Amino acid sequence: MMKNRFGGERLEVRGERIVLARLICLIVISLTSYLLPLTSTAQIVDAFQGILPVTDPTMKKSLNGEWRLKVVDGIDDQTAVPVEDETWGKIPVPGCWEAYGFCKPSYDKALPLTGYYRTSFNVPEAWRGMRIVLRFDGVLYGYDLWVNGKKAGQWRSGYNTAMFDITDCLKGRGAQQLAMRVISQFPGSDFDYNDDWAPNGIFRDVTLMAVPKTHLADLTIRTKNTGEVSVETVVVGKGAIVKHEILDAQGRKVGTDKVEHPHLWTAETPYLYKLRTTLLEKGRPIQTFEHRFGFRELTIDGNILKLNGQSIKLRGVTCHSTDPRSVKVISDDLTLRDMKLMKEASVNYIRTSHYPREPRFYELADSLGFYVIDEVPFGYGDKNLSKEEFYPVLQQRAQATIRRDKNHPSVLIWSLGNENPLTDICIRLGDYVKTQLDSSRPYCYPQVGSYFRRFFEGKEGKGFPSPAPIYTPHYPTTGQIAGFYQHRDRPVIFTEYCHTLGISFEDHDRQWEIIQRTPGIAGGSVWEWVDQGMPFTVLPLQRELEGDSKAGMFGYEEKVYTSKNAGFEMYGNKGTDGLLYADRTPLPNYYELQHNYARAFVTDSILTTADGTLRLNITNRYDFLNLKDNVTFSWAYSEDRDTLVRGAFSPDCAPHVSVPYTLALPVPPDASRICLLHITITDAQGNTFLHQSIPVNPSDLTPRLLAGLTAKSGDPMSVVQDGILVRAGRKATLGEMVKLVGKRLERYLLRLSADGKTAGPIAADIKTEPAGNAMHYTFSLTPDTTDTVLTELGIAFLLDKNIDRVQWIGNGPLPTYPGRYRAGRYGFWSKQQGDLYFEGNRRGVDAALLTDKNGGGLLLFCRNGNVNFEQTDRGIVVSYNAAVSGQGPKFRQTAFPVIAKEVGTVSGDFWLYRVDAKNVPQLIHDLFDHPRTIAAPFKPFVTQYDTYLMRYNDITE
């Protein structure tokens, strides 16, 4: 049944009576704008001016394209737009000024600038007699409009859509002149600033629309899982009738106010219906709308968040609008690329930090299947939140956000601001949202974790001061997730957690596993999806050529260079917090997230055969879908590098459970070889979201290597440039540079003393002895008793400069560290020097072959060891590490430190074998590829932070 929310009461709007009908709600209002009181901050207007945005393509026209622009220093909020002259430039709309050289980039807060725009447009002849409306989907930050010299409107919220009825400003036929003044600062503009770039300009679509004098002003869709549809409509004018029909995904009419046995919408089953709404006047259709919607019900049961009666887990990320070339102009292609990568990482939830996204984003979230926490934009500006005059500003922003996005099934929750103090007007805003804008969804206040916890520790009164139905604290420790947040009285969503910083992403696996098994914690969103990169074409790598060893090609810079004079600027380390680089190249952390968030997986780390079968244990972390017919496990069984058999299956496994699965293996495993079961897991939409490789009947590889290295080939040290080194640290990550200032060794490759007993502050006992045709190295290292953080401790070698490729048997292909190792899987891996993912520690290594292109070089083998590959200007440094620290999260020290005074004595052993390219043992042919067949290095950048290059002499003592 079509219902209205007014309960049959008679209401008054500006003296005009609201007319209510049982099936259709007709509200008569005037054509004038809704105006809130004029305050000292801004004229607060209804963002949509009593007009429902049209969906009929014949009733709208894009004004995107080339406009004229002049940018001047300072804020001019009084002068009308000046006459265009030769000082004006051209800019595409949408387009940010910074991307086209009109101003310099600024972070956190926009520079004080004013931009003047001019363009012209024609009104289609078919629209004569209709109301003409301009729609701006986003302009940073505040703006005023003139059409043909007449003031047409004003808006002061950069990330919100606003519309303007310009009918009375038009002049006859022909070109209409549009002028616009954009200012970057005004009272309340802080609400549009965040820990983010602060660009300027018209950055979203501009659309011209036509509406009849009698028209729809608003439309709200509500659904029940039983198939009932409630549509509330608001009509401007008298005597009109609204009719609805519901179409299924194939375009077939299935009802008008109810659908029998509806398909329910979830992120796993994003089935969309279409509501076709027709406004008729005297029996003639004068407006037609089409809105896609889904049947779903969101409820809270105690402290459990449920969708369609089922508890759900939100596997999330936060996501700024970021394009490294166009700044904040986001194309469909880029959003689709993001969402494809998210699906492949099993992400099912996006927080639109810290503002509503462009309209197309929500359409794609609806159709592809994502849950969204949609954010009302007030980021900075805390000082304003104790001032009553800013309450209407918050109301305006909430109204503009919610009215635009309320019919999207993907939007589950409204987020009110970000990390703001909970002042009186913030708390009242929540009540306003719930009672006046949308009673069907919960709202929340994302909070700094320490601030949130104060409410429960008696430091900020007693209990949380708002009835917000969901708690949304930030950055809990692993212990807090396991303790403090376990039994809250409302659902908990960590709207920011496990902050990435460069390649630091420690402990996400443990945090997510606790979230996964705790009913009252509904999920979380990792900060941040993508680096906040701004294009730059200055600061070329010439500094390196001029002898500055701390910059350019060799040395740390908080930038990504795509060429020697262009790349992405991240404003120091503030914007280097993405799972992806700004151009969407994944960092290793992306693959760690992919493994930890996986919707389905084989839980076994080792498999054994029994009666010609492998018994697997399979876990399903979908909330609604059985794996049967929805997920495919493609598998391959290999021995050494030979794949012997392949297959695929789709197990019968209900949501939230684990089941055994027996896989028939038609060939008996050869115990003398390395046997692996490789699993690739793909959903029904073709998104491959997990790769696994699991050892089958594993055994020690070392005896096989010692027996198989039959060729005598000389001293391994003949391909080593600088003798035996002690590694007592590593190249610092972004996080370590901040947290370990004065605590780490900047020169961490230490040469042995003349007697071989010390290396810098470390006592060393290193012994070598022949082992067949290899050399066996045993060592013990004892650091001094200082607070020095060593990060890595072991034995290292600078290899001959011609050695430029590595192959290894162990965990890969990405670097792995304590607290960040889940993405590593056992197998046969290879990289060439220069590859983006070349450097770093690998865990669980049994053998590593380092050669030149012809196959000459060095074989290092060990038992389940840590082996590090590092690039320098003089060649590759390979290390066998006896101790490795974690890389830490952003805000805290690593939970896995290697501190000199605490580590005591560490020891280890490994073997080296000199490989002669002209006399390679058959075993090496069996286990490794010929070096010439190794794939070319993946090198999307010239250099980049965290995997930057260093000069050997700068890191050696």
Can you name each region flagged by the protein language model?
Residues 138, 184, 266, 670-672, ...:
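Beta-strand/loop-rich accessory regions of lumenal/periplasmic or secreted enzymes
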Residues 46-54, 152-153, 173, 177-210, ...:
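Glycine/proline-rich low-complexity spacer/linker segments in large multi-domain proteins
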Residues 258-260, 641-672:
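Intrinsically disordered, low-complexity Pro/Gly/Ser/Thr-rich segments with frequent PxxP/GP/PP motifs
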Residues 46-53, 59, 93-103, 190, ...:
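Extended substrate-binding grooves/exosites of carbohydrate-active enzymes
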Residues 43-135, 186, 190-194, 199-202, ...:
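Extended carbohydrate-recognition surfaces in non-catalytic/accessory domains of CAZymes
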Residues 171-175, 232-301, 671, 678-679, ...:
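Extended acidic/polar, glycine-enriched regions
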Residues 99, 168-231, 235-237, 248, ...:
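An acidic-aromatic loop/edge-strand motif
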